Amino acid sequence: MNKKTRIAITGPIGRMGRMLIKEIQNNKQSHLTVAVVQKKHQLIGQDIGRIIGIGEIGVLISDELNIKKNDFDVLIDFTRPAGTLEYLKYCNKFKKNIVIGTTGFSKEEIDIIKSYSQKIAIIIASNFSIGINLLFQLIKKTTQIIGKDSDINILEYHHRNKIDAPSGTALEIGEVISKVMNWNLNQDSIYYQKGITGIRDAKKIGFSIVRAGNIVGKHTVMFSSCDEEIKITHTASNRMSFARGAIQSALWIHKKNTGLFDMTDVLSL
């Protein structure tokens, strides 16, 4: 009988953390062993299962990842860039692999993550949903066929508490398109604003961003020509699809030694 992969979760009390824990508990191949919060958090020492409403599971909330180094195989992190980089230091020190779902990294921070991948195995993805990763492939193919004849726009919608914009997923969609078109996403993007904007530049990707209510996540890519329009849309109805993909990634990366991976590697796309 195969041993279960022991997983540590950072930010276990947040929306994503709760979903991850519930999915781990439902997965026969994984086992939650560590739940890490910020220093001096008021819930330290409490059973995380009781806190998130699934009953006691024997995992106490801690702010000391270093003393838990022998208790987990893979860390899953959906926090913020500064926190992720700190957890990466721990993982590198203790030779633990990590799954990163945090978004909003700067180029310099991405370079730091890449440097750590020479010593440990890292999966980083803007979106762990299987559906959104299939969307990336559809967008790539569509861009190859009609990209040069279309105005391309990305519309993304998220809940009012999301702190980064555009979303990491929207930016990744932009990168997929830019690679096919041989564009530079940083230079060849339009972020719509009021006023006289002039005629739309055909060789740019337009971004429209909505933050409202409790929208989990919706991304639409529009390919518009003079004669027709194609829309490709992915809508997440809840966060469980993200959690399942992250757990699948943790199981996949458990036995890897080093390297930087994403969901296309996990899904063999």
From Swiss-Prot:
Catalytic EC class: oxidoreductase
Main location: cytoplasm
Binding, NAD(+): G11, P12, I13, G14, R15, M16, G101, T102, T103, A125, S126, N127, F128
GO biological process: diaminopimelate biosynthetic process; lysine biosynthetic process via diaminopimelate
InterPro entries listed in its UniProt record: DapB_C, DapB_N, DapB_N_CS, DHDPR_bac, NAD(P)-bd_dom_sf
Cellular location(s): Cytoplasm
GO MF term list: 4-hydroxy-tetrahydrodipicolinate reductase; NAD binding; NADP binding; oxidoreductase activity, acting on CH or CH2 groups, NAD or NADP as acceptor
Residues reported in the UniProt entry to bind (S)-2,3,4,5-tetrahydrodipicolinate: H159, G168, T169
Annotated GO CC locations: cytosol
Binding site for NADP(+): K39
Keyword Magnesium: no
Transmembrane segments: none
Keywords: Amino-acid biosynthesis, Cytoplasm, Diaminopimelate biosynthesis, Lysine biosynthesis, NAD, NADP, Oxidoreductase
Pathway where it operates: Amino-acid biosynthesis; L-lysine biosynthesis via DAP pathway; (S)-tetrahydrodipicolinate from L-aspartate: step 4/4
Entry's family note: Belongs to the DapB family.
Function, as annotated: Catalyzes the conversion of 4-hydroxy-tetrahydrodipicolinate (HTPA) to tetrahydrodipicolinate.
Name of the protein in its database record: 4-hydroxy-tetrahydrodipicolinate reductase
Upper taxonomic lineage: Bacteria, Pseudomonadati, Pseudomonadota, Gammaproteobacteria, Enterobacterales
